[in-house]
Amino acid sequence: RNTVHYDALIYVASWPEPRIAAWDALLKARAIENMAYCIGVNRTGIDGNGHNYPGHSAVYDVLGNRLVFSDREEILYATLHKEHIRENREKFRFLADGDSFVLT
């Protein structure tokens, strides 16, 4: 399990069009469950096998709100606020509920 010693998660991926709804849902879920900004970068275009990659690059805040989104090749910008993370981690303290353990 991840620890909470980070403020942003970055995922670089190649999710094809038939599965893009899962990509969108997972990015939002990762932001919420980790109380961290989630930055997802997905490829665009068509590969050599004819599979379409529709982008859906996005940034989500700690509450799962989508800040920016693109379904094409472009540069996205988002401002991330450390205070927003701190306030929400203080308000929703579930990250402190995790147990530390080792599997052997």
Regions found by a protein language model. Name each.
Residues 43-104:
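C-terminal beta-strand edge segments of enzyme domains
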Residues 1-34, 38-40:
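Active-site beta-loop-alpha substructure in enzyme catalytic cores
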